[in-house]
């Protein structure tokens, strides 16, 4: 006769969950569970303490106003407005809708340069009307409230200011673009030491307090088609004046206005796509084939009749 299979499983999983005889939950008494809880509480508490401590030590070595390591920061890039998709500005003189986005881009950039926002009890100060030397305002590390910033008057951009022509020349087929150097904290741009190494068009107007900018046709055959290019900036100079540098960062100069240069193409050949390259010149301005915006930018312009 076959032996009957024992059906006694010792209580099974129910007894494992709660053993009333031994007063155990999941195989452990209350005292055992308490010891385990205290152990892990202390263990993870120590881990959290070590983590928080290392973070605190690291924060003590970091300035609230200046990055600790800046040796790999590249020289500033040169950017422009209006921002164009695939760097292409294409519009029709007879169709205002075709250049509406370009005009709105310029308005968005220049709205902070309105004179009303630079008047009254503000951190702005007059730094002259002609280019001058750097204006230093103490160490970056010190926090003494907001540091003063130089005013930049919209009227200096003349035809590209939008004051007299709200279309910035687009309605007449004479488009404007606004160039600016990207902000780098604590950067002192160095102008060319002399004008002999500059393009011939810049040599006559060399200024020791300005980083000049120059635009020209990318292709030799486009030089005649591009025609005359006019530059508008502080003191009538097409470049970036030194008194707006160095930049102290958003925490100390949240109202900082970087200098701008208005560039207007006054007699472009219509119905032809023209490729233009603009470069800023300085002793510590670099250019790179890998980064096409480093010290320069390219833009394609097509004015349709």
From Swiss-Prot:
Membrane topology (UniProt): Single-pass type II membrane protein
Bilayer-crossing regions: 33-53
Gene3D superfamilies: 1.20.5.170, Na, k-atpase alpha subunit
Pfam families in alphabetical order: Na_K-ATPase
UniProt signal peptide: none
PROSITE patterns: ATPASE_NA_K_BETA_1 (PS00390), ATPASE_NA_K_BETA_2 (PS00391)
Intracellular or extracellular location(s): Cell membrane
Positions bearing carbohydrate: 114, 159, 194, 267
Keywords: Cell membrane, Disulfide bond, Glycoprotein, Ion transport, Membrane, Potassium, Potassium transport, Signal-anchor, Sodium, Sodium transport, Sodium/potassium transport, Transmembrane, Transmembrane helix, Transport
Extracellular side: 54-305
Superkingdom in the source lineage: Eukaryota
Residues in compartment: Cytoplasmic: 1-32
InterPro entries linked to this entry: Na/K_ATPase_sub_beta, Na/K_ATPase_sub_beta_sf
Disulphide linkage map: 127-150, 160-176, 215-278
GO biological process: intracellular potassium ion homeostasis; intracellular sodium ion homeostasis; potassium ion import across plasma membrane; sodium ion export across plasma membrane
Recorded GO CC terms: sodium:potassium-exchanging ATPase complex
GO molecular function terms listed in the Swiss-Prot or TrEMBL record: ATPase activator activity
Complex formation: The sodium/potassium-transporting ATPase is composed of a catalytic alpha subunit, an auxiliary non-catalytic beta subunit and an additional regulatory subunit.
Summary of the function given for this chain in its UniProt record: This is the non-catalytic component of the active enzyme, which catalyzes the hydrolysis of ATP coupled with the exchange of Na(+) and K(+) ions across the plasma membrane. The beta subunit regulates, through assembly of alpha/beta heterodimers, the number of sodium pumps transported to the plasma membrane.
Family indicated by similarity: Belongs to the X(+)/potassium ATPases subunit beta family.
Name of the protein in its database record: Sodium/potassium-transporting ATPase subunit beta-1
Species of provenance: Tetronarce californica (Pacific electric ray)
Gene this chain is encoded by: atp1b1
């Amino acid at each position: 006769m076959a032996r009957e299979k024992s059906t006694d499983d010792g209580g099974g999983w129910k007894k494992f969950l709660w053993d009333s005889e031994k007063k155990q939950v999941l195989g452990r008494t209350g005292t055992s569970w308490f010891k385990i809880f205290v152990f892990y509480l202390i263990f993870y508490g120590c881990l959290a303490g070590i983590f928080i401590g290392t973070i605190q030590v690291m924060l003590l070595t970091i300035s609230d106003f200046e990055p600790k390591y800046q040796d790999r920061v590249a020289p500033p890039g040169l950017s422009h407005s209006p921002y164009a998709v695939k760097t292409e500005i294409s519009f029709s003189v007879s169709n205002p809708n075709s250049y509406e986005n370009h005009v709105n881009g310029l308005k968005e950039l220049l709205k902070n340069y309105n004179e009303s926002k630079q008047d009254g009890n503000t951190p702005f100060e007059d730094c002259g009307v002609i280019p001058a030397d750097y204006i230093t305002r103490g160490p970056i590390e010190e926090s003494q409230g907001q540091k003063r910033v130089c005013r930049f008057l919209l009227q200096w951009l003349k035809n590209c200011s939008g004051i007299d022509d709200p279309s910035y020349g687009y309605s007449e087929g004479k488009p404007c673009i606004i160039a600016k150097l990207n902000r780098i904290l604590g950067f002192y741009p160095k102008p060319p030491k002399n004008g002999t190494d500059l393009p011939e068009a810049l040599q006559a107007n060399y200024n020791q307090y300005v980083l000049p900018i120059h635009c020209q046709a990318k292709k030799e055959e486009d030089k005649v088609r591009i025609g005359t290019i006019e530059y508008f900036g502080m003191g009538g100079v097409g470049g970036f004046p030194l008194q707006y540098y160095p930049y102290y960062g958003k925490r100390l100069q949240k109202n900082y206005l970087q200098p701008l240069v208005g560039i207007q193409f006054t007699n472009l050949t219509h119905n032809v796509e023209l490729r233009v390259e603009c470069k800023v010149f300085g002793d510590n301005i670099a250019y790179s084939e890998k980064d096409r915006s480093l010290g320069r930018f390219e833009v394609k312009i097509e004015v349709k009749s």
